[in-house]
């Protein structure tokens, strides 16, 4: 049985790291791309803060403090 060869995957530097785009992009295009990336990060952080605020307002505490006391559970 012949051994199958895996296809080579080439990721251009312009995809994996936009700072390597070279002279093909104008400063305006680079600036717009960076602004779009910054806007995406800001939106994601705002959404995370909104979720955290909603969880706090509904009484969900996410401090990872899972102290268990049997007496308090049993009303003793």
UniProtKB/Swiss-Prot annotation:
Similarity section: Belongs to the alphaherpesvirinae envelope protein US9 family.
Biological source species: Equine herpesvirus 1 (strain AB1) (EHV-1)
GO cellular component terms listed in the entry, alphabetical order: host cell Golgi membrane; host cell plasma membrane; host cell smooth endoplasmic reticulum membrane; membrane; viral envelope; virion membrane
Keyword list, A-Z: Host cell membrane, Host endoplasmic reticulum, Host Golgi apparatus, Host membrane, Membrane, Viral envelope protein, Virion
Entry's localization field: Virion membrane; Host Golgi apparatus membrane; Host smooth endoplasmic reticulum membrane; Host cell membrane
Function, in words: Essential for the anterograde spread of the infection throughout the host nervous system. Together with the gE/gI heterodimer, US9 is involved in the sorting and transport of viral structural components toward axon tips.
Membrane topology listed for this record: Single-pass type II membrane protein
Name of protein: Envelope protein US9 homolog
Chief subcellular location: virion
